Amino acid sequence: MTATASDDEAVTALALSAAKGNGRALEAFIKATQQDVWRFVAYLSDVGSADDLTQETFLRAIGAIPRFSARSSARTWLLAIARHVVADHIRHVRSRPRTTRGARPEHLIDGDRHARGFEDLVEVTTMIADLTTDQREALLLTQLLGLSYADAAAVCGCPVGTIRSRVARARDALLADAEPDDLTG
């Protein structure tokens, strides 16, 4: 699901209401953002950890929501928290032996798909996984989650121009990895 400006405004309004102690607004805020957070952390880390990382993201967000002041959209604020959760997780995982290898693409699709569609998904997922972390993060934030370049820059803590160049490099890398036959259909 790609976020629209009206979606972001509604989610931000829910977060502001939750910051004032409205439990129903907090519940609605979590429901409205849970899928985006899960997909973001699944791509940045691995599917096996996505549920735990999503939960940790929301635990941190709930603790910090009384201080949320809407300087950015609530979605941007939440994805920045998710990014920090993933970074903490990666630091922890690097300190011990790794037992799993990346995301399993079959967990990233909904329902039954045709075999070719599944093969395409596996190929694209593998190509995205081969991007640098910075490129993958910028591409996912702007192209999958639909954040503006400015919001993606806020999540990543870097200038907008850096996000633009990371997305451009990611697209170039994906096109270079694609086989010529795939480009012509």
UniProtKB/Swiss-Prot annotation:
Residues 123-174 are annotated as: Sigma-70 factor domain-4. GO terms for biological process: DNA-templated transcription initiation; regulation of DNA-templated transcription; response to heat; response to hypoxia; response to water; response to xenobiotic stimulus. It holds the Pfam family Sigma70_r2. A motif (Polymerase core binding) lies at residues 52-55. Disruption phenotype: No effect on growth in culture, or in isolated macrophages; infected guinea pigs have a highly attenuated infection with few granulomas and no necrotic centers. Residues 30-94 are annotated as: Sigma-70 factor domain-2. The keyword Transcription applies. The keyword Zinc does not apply. One of its GO terms (molecular function) is sigma factor activity. Coiled coil: none annotated. Signal peptide: none annotated. InterPro entries: RNA_pol_sigma-70-like, RNA_pol_sigma-70_dom, RNA_pol_sigma70_ECF_CS, RNA_pol_sigma70_r2, RNA_pol_sigma70_r4_t2, RNA_pol_sigma_r2, RNA_pol_sigma_r3/r4-like, WH-like_DNA-bd_sf. Induction: The most abundant of the sigma factor transcripts, it is expressed in exponential phase; repressed by detergent (7-fold), heat shock (9-fold, 45 degrees Celsius) and in stationary phase. Not autoregulated. Keywords: DNA-binding, Sigma factor, Transcription, Transcription regulation. It comes from the Bacteria. Residues 149-168 bind DNA. Was identified as a high-confidence drug target. The sigma-70 factor domain-2 mediates sequence-specific interaction with the -10 element in promoter DNA, and plays an important role in melting the double-stranded DNA and the formation of the transcription bubble. The sigma-70 factor domain-2 mediates interaction with the RNA polymerase subunits RpoB and RpoC. The sigma-70 factor domain-4 contains a helix-turn-helix (H-T-H) motif that mediates interaction with the -35 element in promoter DNA. The domain also mediates interaction with the RNA polymerase subunit RpoA. Interacts transiently with the RNA polymerase catalytic core formed by RpoA, RpoB, RpoC and RpoZ (2 alpha, 1 beta, 1 beta' and 1 omega subunit) to form the RNA polymerase holoenzyme that can initiate transcription. Belongs to the sigma-70 factor family. ECF subfamily. PANTHER family: ECF RNA POLYMERASE SIGMA FACTOR SIGC (PTHR43133:SF61), RNA POLYMERASE ECF-TYPE SIGMA FACTO (PTHR43133). Sigma factors are initiation factors that promote the attachment of RNA polymerase to specific initiation sites and are then released. Extracytoplasmic function (ECF) sigma factors are usually held in an inactive form by an anti-sigma factor until released by regulated intramembrane proteolysis; this sigma factor does not seem to have a cognate anti-sigma factor however. It has been suggested that the sigma domains 2 and 4 may interact via polar residues in this protein to autoregulate. Positively regulates expression of a small regulon of genes. This is ECF RNA polymerase sigma factor SigC. It comes from Mycobacterium tuberculosis (strain ATCC 25618 / H37Rv). The gene is sigC.
